[in-house]
Every structure is written in C-alpha cells, then in structure tokens.
C-alpha cells in the first residue's frame, strides 16, 4: 500500500537516502527492535489512504543525528501506516491477509521486509516480478478477466521458484 494507495512510500525514503546509503544503513537496523520515532512521512501535505485528509501535514520530527535511527523510524512508520491501511480494508470487508507479495525497490530491503512482517503479522515475500507496477498490473488483470486472473497470478508467482 505504501506508495500506491498512500502518499507515503519509496519516494519519501528516496528523498533522504541514496540507494547505496539505504542498503548500507539498512544492514545496521535490528528489525526486531521497535523504533520510538512516530513519523507520518509525506513529501507534501495531503494523504489519500488510510487517512483521507488533503491537508494532512508531513511529520518527520524529531530527526535524530544518527542516520540509522532516522531510517529505522522511517521504515517503522511506513510499515505502521501500511498495517493501518490493511486493517481499514478489513473493516470494509476485505479478506484478511495471509501473506504479502511485495515488488519494487523495497522488496530487496531485508530489514524493511522484517519490520513489515512484524506489523502485518503475516509473511512478506518478494514477488516474482521486481517492478513496482506489478501489483497495479495484477489489479488491472483481475478487473479485466476476474475468473481466470487468480490462476494466472498464482502461476506467475509459483513459476518464480
């Protein structure tokens, strides 16, 4: 949901960290330890989901001097917002999560994957496709051919192995 339904996500993360820095700092995060930082990381005011508020202000304070602590707080906050989104979807009648298949740059970040699992309480695995638009493509497929799309998607993910 981060970067898709929500205005939080990779773009916010990439504003503060280069890919090499992100990779190096992520290895120094203990994903089993919760960060005390409570951010709502937005690039500009306004959120769509899970909070529908066009005036919601970004919250990226306090900002620790230690870049590892800052990244840890950012990844924790993105994961918390993602969990809030899935919880809200379930309140509206969506099927409860059993696993999350993830794509895009964040799928390669082991620390973030572990943090997401802690918040979502389900396995988070990399999808067979690495492109960030993969989830959107799956939704489009289901909207176009709803009866055959589940088998197609399942086969794509199984063939990855």
What are these regions (language model features)?
Residues 1-100, 108-160:
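Active-site core segments that coordinate phosphate-bearing ligands/cofactors
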């Amino acid at each position: 949901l981060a970067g898709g339904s929500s205005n939080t996500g990779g773009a916010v993360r990439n504003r503060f960290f280069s890919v090499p820095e992100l990779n190096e700092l992520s290895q120094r995060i203990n994903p089993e330890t919760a960060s005390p930082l409570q951010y709502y990381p937005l690039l500009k005011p306004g959120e769509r989901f899970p909070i529908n508020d066009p005036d919601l202000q970004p919250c990226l304070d306090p900002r620790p001097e230690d870049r590892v602590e800052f990244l840890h707080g950012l990844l924790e906050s993105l994961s918390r917002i993602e969990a809030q989104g899935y919880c809200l979807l379930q309140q509206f009648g969506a099927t409860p999560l059993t696993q999350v298949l993830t794509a895009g740059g964040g799928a390669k970040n082991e620390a973030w994957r572990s943090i997401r699992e802690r918040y979502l309480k389900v396995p988070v695995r990399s999808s067979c496709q690495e492109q960030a638009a993969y989830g959107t493509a799956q939704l489009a497929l289901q909207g176009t051919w709803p009866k055959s799309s589940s088998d197609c998607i399942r086969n794509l993910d199984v063939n990855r192995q």
